[in-house]
């Protein structure tokens, strides 16, 4: 277990991945098209990031935008994409499948988790669309996933902080709960103090429209989060 909470940053380009690493991120979630919540990155992007970035990289496995109810063809595509990500040296994968009842698709998620081994699986924020978070927690644990990325069912982690704290406690020693959605230097202290989470996820994608000045701003924002996480709780501000 890491001494300090781990910071995962979601990115969609090589430049952003490199800036996140320079800024102090501990891990990267690699996607494309973050405007729709992220989809599976291209083979070329995975290869480029793997060759240039030295911290762990987890690849999103999501064949399209929209809901998380996947056809059999889409499911097979996810399995193929997962195998490609594994072959390209990704350190983990991020995915989530629901049934038409909005509950976790345990069977097919477990199949993908088995295909991913020994890579860890993060079940993404499809979790927040389930009707009962505690039931969904047990379902995800049953799939063999290593962690859940969640806002606690709210629009943001700050708004879902109470549910997040309950999930962290309920999942302790069985699965990692990683708060995500709207996490910033302004609210990370309260989220960590309330939830006692050991990992946090932030996108910061709104500050990266330019490959020059705004990427320096992106790196600075990541650095602020990383600096806060490396301080003892009493010294965070």
Task: Identify the residue ranges that each predicted region occupies.
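Hydrophobic, well-structured mid-protein blocks that either form specific transmembrane helices
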Residues: 86-143
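Alpha-helix-loop-beta-strand connector modules within alpha/beta enzyme cores
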Residues: 38-65, 104-126, 159-185, 217-236
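N-terminal amphipathic alpha-helix/helix-capping segment at the start of soluble metabolic enzymes
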Residues: 1-10, 14, 50-51, 233-236
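Active-site-proximal loop/turn and secondary-structure-junction residues that shape catalytic pockets
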Residues: 13-15, 32-34, 63-65, 99-101, ...
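Catalytic cores of alpha/beta
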Residues: 12-22, 69-84, 121, 128-143, ...
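Glycine-rich phosphate-binding active-site loops on the catalytic face of alpha/beta enzymes
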Residues: 27-39, 84-100, 145-158, 195-219
């Amino acid at each position: 277990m890491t001494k300090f909470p781990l910071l995962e940053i979601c990115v969609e380009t090589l430049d952003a991945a490199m800036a996140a690493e320079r800024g102090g991120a501990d891990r990267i979630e690699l996607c494309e098209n973050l405007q729709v919540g992220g989809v599976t990155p291209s083979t070329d992007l995975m290869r480029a990031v793997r060759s240039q970035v030295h911290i762990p990289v987890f690849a999103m496995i999501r064949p399209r935008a929209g809901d998380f109810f996947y056809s059999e063809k889409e499911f097979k595509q996810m399995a193929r994409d997962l195998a490609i990500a594994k072959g390209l040296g990704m350190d983990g994968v991020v995915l989530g499948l629901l049934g038409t009842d909005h509950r976790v698709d345990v069977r097919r998620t477990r199949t993908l988790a088995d295909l991913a081994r020994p890579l860890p699986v993060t079940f993404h924020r499809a979790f927040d669309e389930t009707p009962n978070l505690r039931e969904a927690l047990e379902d995800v644990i049953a799939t063999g996933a290593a962690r859940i990325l969640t806002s606690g069912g709210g629009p943001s982690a700050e708004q879902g902080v109470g549910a997040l704290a309950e999930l962290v406690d309920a999942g302790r020693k069985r699965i990692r709960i990683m708060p995500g959605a709207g996490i910033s230097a302004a609210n990370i202290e309260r989220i960590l103090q309330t939830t006692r989470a050991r990992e946090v996820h932030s996108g910061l994608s709104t500050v990266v429209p330019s490959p020059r000045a705004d990427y320096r701003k992106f790196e600075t924002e990541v650095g602020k989060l990383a600096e806060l996480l490396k301080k003892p709780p009493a010294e965070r501000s």
